[in-house]
Amino acid sequence: MHAFVISGIQSGTGKTSISIAITAAIMRRNLKVQPFKVGPDFIDPSHYSFCEWAVNLDSFMMDEDGVRRSFSKWMNGKDVGIIEGVMGLFDGYRLSTFSSTSHIAKILNLPVILVMDVKAMSLSALALFEGFRNFDRGLNIAGVIFNNATRFHQKLKRVFEERGYRVFGVVPKSEILEMESRHLGLHLGMEVDRDVNALAEFAEEHIDLDGILEVSEIHNEFYKVEKDFEENGNLRIGIPFDQAFSFYYRDNLDVLKKIGRLEFFSPLKGERVDCDVYYIGGGYPELYEFPDFLKFIKKEALDEKPVYAECGGMMVLARSLESEETRRKMAGVLDIDIVFTKKLQALGYVKGEIINENPFFDTGFRGHEFHYSYAIPDSDMRFAFRTDGRGIDNGLDGALAYNTLAGYSHIHFYSTKFLPELREKV
């Protein structure tokens, strides 16, 4: 079994495109690959869907044991684990290394491959690399990949090697990686028509895959955990999943499988499922029309079926959704109006405590908030949570109505208890 972390010295080094290319190339060797993504982001994990949707590893939301448990579970039966980092290697929570890529690498005791954009850089690249190595000597930085390199950087590679450092790739500027990078952060993986074979061939030509596999063999005992994703219980859990609704942590879905049977459906295709409870994740509902789903989910909510919704899912349940161009009626389950802006309204981790009884959670939680909209709730709106983020109303989040709970917070279920008693409530 092999596993390694691919990190950048900062955002924008090309680590995501290179990680995707390496994943494609290793898959082509008939090895079973499991991709992971450090941090709470939903978009980057989707770009590995040609292999498997990447699993988020986040020590703030999951704690260290949760990171180990998740990694072990998803690596069961796999040959290679590829963990794409977030931001720069040491960039973590509130100017610390906590929850950073380096923190995840140390929790799992994995080697790090550092991606450096060496365009317009020569020996300074060596100074940067040695600075990163010396910043935390307890971290195993196994080597480097030069990105946006020229023929000159073959000479720089020799300088690195004379110092005893591994250079796993001298990657030139290329149309295929540029095309890949244009999609990142803008489109979901399911919307991208990528040439996986071309990416694999590019990686085989410019990256020392054998060398990376050589330094990334793992033997840690905690990886040997039984994988059990069998669906248990008779509770039917309806989950909309398509281009409008796709922001779900894979571990959250796995938790739900332990209390019921997941029923996925596409509102954009007019699909619907008759279930006992509904979980509406985030995504881009503002970009699409789904009038039949609005009517359907309103009826289910008003019939007191439990409905849990996050961010974009909460917007669907609101009274209206307004942007500069339009004002749309939504399901009207919640007495809330949503206003979209061009300015980011909230970004960051959140901690939440329970302040009112609700159908889904009875303990505090950790999660993430990221949205360009704000909510205008009626003055008598009741809330289930108080958070240290923005939430719906100055930190109050988790709007309550009927048997519905909806808020801006994306909650990781490893940080709380998604009520197993729900089976007795429906």
For every predicted segment, state its role:
Residues L123-F229:
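Internal gly/pro-rich beta-alpha loop/helix module
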Residues I18:
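Hydrophobic positions on the alpha1 helix immediately C-terminal to the Walker A/P-loop
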Residues F229-E300:
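Phosphate-binding active sites in nucleotide-utilizing proteins
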Residues M190-G233, F241-F245, D397-V426:
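Acyltransferase
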Residues E231-N232, F245-V255, L347-V426:
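C-terminal and late-domain segments of enzyme folds
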Residues F71-S72, L177-V192, D276-I280, G348-V350:
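Short, surface-exposed amphipathic charged segments that create phosphate/polyanion-binding patches used
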Residues Y284-E357:
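Cysteine-nucleophile active-site neighborhood
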Residues H2-G14, T23-L108, M116-A142, F152-Q154:
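ATP-dependent carboxylate-amine ligase catalytic core
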